[in-house]
Amino acid sequence: MPNFQKFETFDKLTTVPCPYAPDCGGCQHIGVPYGHQAQNKINDLSGLFTAAEVAFPKPLKVLSAGPAHLRDRLDFSLQDGRLGLYRTDRHEILDIEVCAQLSPALQGWLSEFRKIQWPFKRGSFRLRVGPEGQRGLWIDLANVDIKTLLDEQNILRSLQQQAFVEIGQRRKVPVWTGNEFKLRDPEHHVWFQSWMNDIPVNLYCQVASFTQPSHTANKIICDVIYDWVKRYKAQRLIEFGSGIGNLTFPALAGAESVLACEIDELSLQGLERSLNELPASMSHLKDRVTIYRRDFQKKLTQDFSQFDGVLANPPRSGLMGFLNPLKSLAPEQRPEFFIYMSCYPESMARDLVTLQECGYRMQEVYIVDQFPQTDHYEVLGLLQREKA
């Protein structure tokens, strides 16, 4: 069993300075001792579970990778020459040169990026640093501004010397043809990393893809998933919301088979590429994964009784109608265990009510504080079906 105690032990008196507090809306608790922040998140989750009449193990535990400098991706905006995040007091961008949330590598990328003089009034950007330190940039502008950027050429040339660039909602890649830039189809590259116990697994995706915010904090999440799955024998696992496979791989390290369900085609292409790129010593594992594309929130065609466990990481809206087929099964036909991960505990609490009605009880729960200095947090819960 992995030892999570080191992540439960942190300096509760630590405070993180920020030159933009209290004007920046990115962080809500800058200056508050870190131990108080952790306790507030415990109180918040306890309150949600209690109000929903969901039974949970006490005391709740917080796993932390640190109070600051965790993020390896940053989403921010351009407004009238200012690059940063929205202010707390009005809908206006606050110009930000440094941020206590950013990893040193990402802070370095932000500092270089800010040297670009943008000829547009508005825009949105994502900066990303990959597991090997590679830099990525996603640019989202109005269509007319994208054309201007392609025609201007110099800014794109400068950016491509520093980073891999994607443009627009369709994540197109600008390619120089010899006399102009053309937008080509999205490309999959290694922008994130999962773990199978202590073995890193490269995840292929786009700069604009959804991932967890931090390489460091994500290792904690993967370790928890691996620890929980391997406790059960003959695990035929069904995963909902697999995305690019961040949770698929730690689950696969302990499971007999995984059916990965996801609606986004680009994400599933990335997962398939990641499976195909496994080292030779692990290549046999890809045959234990089946990929299934479908909107699981609306209609589930899979039979829950064919699986020993469920792994769910739904969007903010929660599982919605996904749990309906579970109710129609006899108790002994339902999967033995259910792992639920969520960054939106309000919808998680609603879903846990249904799972409790289906005979599941929470065995363990962790708050993973990968969003320090903010109200947000990740929750991982392990539920087990009560035996008849």
Swiss-Prot record:
Sorted UniProt keywords: 4Fe-4S, Iron, Iron-sulfur, Metal-binding, Methyltransferase, S-adenosyl-L-methionine, Transferase
Ranges in a coiled coil: none
Active site, UniProt feature: C343
Family: Belongs to the class I-like SAM-binding methyltransferase superfamily. RNA M5U methyltransferase family.
Leading EC class: transferase
UniProt keyword annotation of S-adenosyl-L-methionine present: yes
Listed PROSITE patterns: RRNA_A_DIMETH, SAM_MT_RNA_M5U, TRMA_1, TRMA_2
Matches recorded under InterPro entries: MeTrfase_TrmA_AS (IPR030390), MeTrfase_TrmA_CS (IPR030391), rRNA_Ade_Mease_Trfase_CS (IPR020596), SAM-dependent_MTases_sf (IPR029063), U5_MeTrfase_fam (IPR010280)
EC number: 2.1.1.-
Binding site for S-adenosyl-L-methionine: Q212, E262, N313
GO BP terms in the entry: rRNA base methylation
Record has Secreted as a keyword: no
GO molecular function, one term: 4 iron, 4 sulfur cluster binding
Source species of the chain: Bdellovibrio bacteriovorus (strain ATCC 15356 / DSM 50701 / NCIMB 9529 / HD100)
Protein name: Uncharacterized RNA methyltransferase Bd2056
Positions of [4Fe-4S] cluster binding: C18, C24, C27, C99
